[in-house]
Amino acid sequence: MKTYTICGSMKFAKEMQEVAYYLETQQDCNVLQCVYTLDDYKPTKEELKKLELAHYQKIDLSDGIYVLNINGYIGESVSKEIEYAKMHGKEVIYHCK
């Protein structure tokens, strides 16, 4: 069973949760998510940096990343995550071809 970290814009948070559920229930994958349900909470710069570092550690632990590129959208942060994953020999799967 492979482990994947989901990478995508937070504007697709709901979709990332749906994809994680699908991958775990239908594709026999383990999924490391980065979506947190914190209504009306704005993280501090320090918290954002900690979350970013944790996300890269999740990529290190994973066999690959699953890029949620809805309508072809890949932002700056996700582009960096893709490059990081490739540099570390990780599989990169794109949601939209």
Each language-model region and where it sits:
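Conserved catalytic or regulatory cores that recognize and/or transform ribose-phosphate-containing ligands
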Residues: 1-97
